[in-house]
Amino acid sequence: RKAAAAGSPEDRVGLALKLAAEYGLTALLSVSWDMTHEMPYSECLSSTKKIMNELWTLYGNEPALAGFYNYQEGSGTYLVWQMREFCAAAKSHDRGILTACAPYIDDPLLAGYLAAIDELDIVIYQGAVMASYRKDNRRCFPYRRVKDFASLSAGATRVKNKITLSHVELFGYLEKQYAGH
């Protein structure tokens, strides 16, 4: 299958940005490495930057483009260096665009480290489990622990004037088993 050319009728990214602009909305473009090709992990960040550069070249002038979102759902402090590089690459195109990531809330140090990245604007925190039918998940990630990490994370980003979002994941698998069916 051939890739759609920017501006062509098959260009879904361009279409989404044009529709967003028409309705007064903005959008973050999701960026990650090219998962259609095998590559060592050490090359993933350079692949991500290459894709981001291509997206900026194609869509950087679109009024609805608000920024870039790294959808790799990392956890732990190892994610910090990747986000620092990702955000710096995005801001190299335009200091005014937004950057975002969605880490798991499972390391209290991660909240502070991500908040310290000046170029990171939005942190979308998520728990491995925030609401689950699975008893093993509730034992592993009790609601109180998720609440504590969410509070810590929101506090860390508030001090640095960042946008903090969190979401609840509702899992529907095994519900019949737990409902007694």
Show the residue positions of the predicted features:
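Glycan-processing catalytic domains of CAZymes
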Residues: 1-181
